[in-house]
Amino acid sequence: MARYIFITGGVVSSLGKGLASAALGALLQARGFSVRLRKLDPYLNVDPGTMSPFEHGEVFVTDDGAETDLDLGHYERFTGVAARSTDSVSSGRIYSTVLEKERRGDYLGKTIQVIPHVTNEIKDFIAIGDDEVDFMLCEIGGTVGDIEGLPFFEAIRQFTHDKPRGQCIFMHLTLLPYLAASGELKTKPTQHSVKELQSIGIAPDILVCRSEHPIPEKEREKIALFCNVRKEAVVAAYDLKTIYDAPLAYHEQGLDQAVLDAFDISPAPKPDLTVWRDVSDRVHNPEGEVKVAIVGKYTQLEDAYKSIAEALTHGGMANRVKVIVEWVDAEVFDTQDVAPHLEGFHAILVPGGFGERGTEGKIKAAQYAREHNVPYLGICLGMQMAVIEAARNVANIKAAGSEEFDHEAGKKRFEPVVYHLKEWVQGNAKVSRRVGDDKGGTMRLGAYDAALTPGTRVADIYHTSAIDERHRHRYEVDIKYRAQLEDAGLVFSGMSPDGKLPEIIEWPNHPWFIGVQFHPELKSKPFDPHPLFADFIRAAKENSRLV
């Protein structure tokens, strides 16, 4: 039976609960324990799949096709444990399930209420896989006191009550604001946050206090006294130069030991932090630097491309270089020349996205990379834009475009080199879709196999002829244009096993130009960089010597 750690937050949002959870998971693994991390989000959306990246940041896709919170990306990157659909839930999903059961008559005519029906559904979700791991870490989204989070707080209170004593603990993240005028940290917001938590029946066992300044021993004792926790359980969380310092920093502050003490695990296994020391060394001691331009649509919010930014960092670690990322708004190229914005970059990456806005700029970025021999990685829409660019400017299909843009405009304007994907094979079943289907959960989602063409660049990079990668798209390069594009020199180097869906394209006469329909960034880790990103940065490093 798993031990449960519930992670909550107070005072303000965006304190870093996800990173703290991921770092703690990594530290417990370093001591020989198995872990699984979960995220419970109070918002009423069923999942983040239809939410704007400006609202929510990126959508992290699991192998089994769940569209989840970006924190699950942190969980995977720090622990190496592949997330599942059962590791993420929202109020919307919980309420939807409860209402479906009510319609089926599962509740036998009873009045449906938040307590017990909604809270029971949350508790059932938390308990999934109870016997699979040593520790289950459950992060509650939002902050204590938010009205939409109350059912989740009540559910974890009940869950802890139902379990044997010592089976569950609570870890609460707060902020210690610093007043420059008086030159002191203020503990009152933390005290009030804990008081709010206690008022709903939850007493934190560990306090993680975010601070920009060292926490004096006197203040630590004060927090412990008024929040009713041991002094050793008041853990400082300071701002770091890189998130990959978090496991070592939290270990230095005693977080993992405080957790083991709270569970009365003694003697505690000693941690092996060799991997994280190596990661930290690679981040802090690069032997050079490369500049990568990300030409995207949501560049005002870096969290919209969180996994891509991290995967580039991982590629830098693999090559002992610092990757300097600059965000370029693709719409700028609608009215301005590409060259002044992209000159001096050692590589160009065009990420995924939806809608026509900014796509002409992405096509121009792909053209610039092709014509100027700049390493190019196109992901999802970035691959589609590279194919459209090749069709227009090399294969002489002047009206080449995407059905997505025609659907958005309500009229036919392009020859659809990229079309709406209406059916595909998933496992042993055929999946069908129509243009008018609901948006949520109707894309080609999750891990799919692909066959690589021997002798191609991607086959050399992967060192295999068969791969599986995660997808999130409803538009696809039309296979009927393959012959025309290959006659122009483009190579379709990766295909779905049935040979119907192009997964990877490349220009063989280019130093490094690859487009992939999937999202390789979702499987990259600091201690195991994705091979595409590692080789992309290798090519950028090589190009940096030529620029």
From Swiss-Prot:
Residues 291-546 form the Glutamine amidotransferase type-1 domain. CTP binds at S13, D146, I147, E148, K186, T187, K188, P189, T190, Q191, K222. Pfam families: CTP_synth_N (PF06418), GATase (PF00117). SUPFAM superfamilies: Class I glutamine amidotransferase-like, P-loop containing nucleoside triphosphate hydrolases. GO terms for cellular component: cytosol. GO terms for biological process: 'de novo' CTP biosynthetic process; pyrimidine nucleobase biosynthetic process. Homotetramer. This is CTP synthase. The lineage of its organism: Bacteria, Pseudomonadati, Pseudomonadota, Alphaproteobacteria, Rhodobacterales.
